[in-house]
């Protein structure tokens, strides 16, 4: 088997395209981030949230979660999974935790704030997550609703840490170094 390396920019574009194809905009996710973080930072703007979502979506782990999750959702819509997995994914069975496991794994890189925020979003289904969780028109979003929650949780955590850095007067050079380290993985 020949090892094939897919260029990062292709993976990034594919992940963005999958979100768009499934009706999820970056603004939808930024709105959730705003709702999560505004109580802790009243100078927060939607543009800050959108920028944080964009940064989170640069991480390969997030991109891979999007690609895998959406692919499985689409296969379930086309009834192309074998049983009993087909029925489990198509119905978003309550005891099927693989969707949450993938999304939670994607949140682990952003620490405890991301993990607890993910749990909150998974339980309360805010914004576009609620729309995705509602089974209408034959669409399956078993994985995507949780992945969107993970992206929003990560962007929220990222903003919380940036706020602390600013409050403590952390130099721009150090903040940019942390920014670069976040893109690993």
Spans of model-derived segments:
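A near-ubiquitous, low-amplitude feature marking generic local secondary-structure context
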Residues: 2-3, 12, 16, 87, ...
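Internal, hydrophobic cores of structured domains that mediate oligomerization or house catalytic pockets
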Residues: 2-12, 114, 119
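Intrinsic-disorder-associated interaction segments
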Residues: 4, 8, 22, 42, ...
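N-terminal interaction modules that seed assembly of large macromolecular complexes
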Residues: 6-73
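Short, hydrophobic/amphipathic alpha-helical patches that form generic packing surfaces
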Residues: 31-35, 68, 102-113, 146-154
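Short, surface-exposed, charged/polar-biased interaction segments
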Residues: 36, 40, 50, 70, ...
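Long, charge-patterned amphipathic interaction tracts in eukaryotic proteins
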Residues: 48-123
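Glycine-rich, aromatic-bearing surface loops/beta-hairpins
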Residues: 118-185
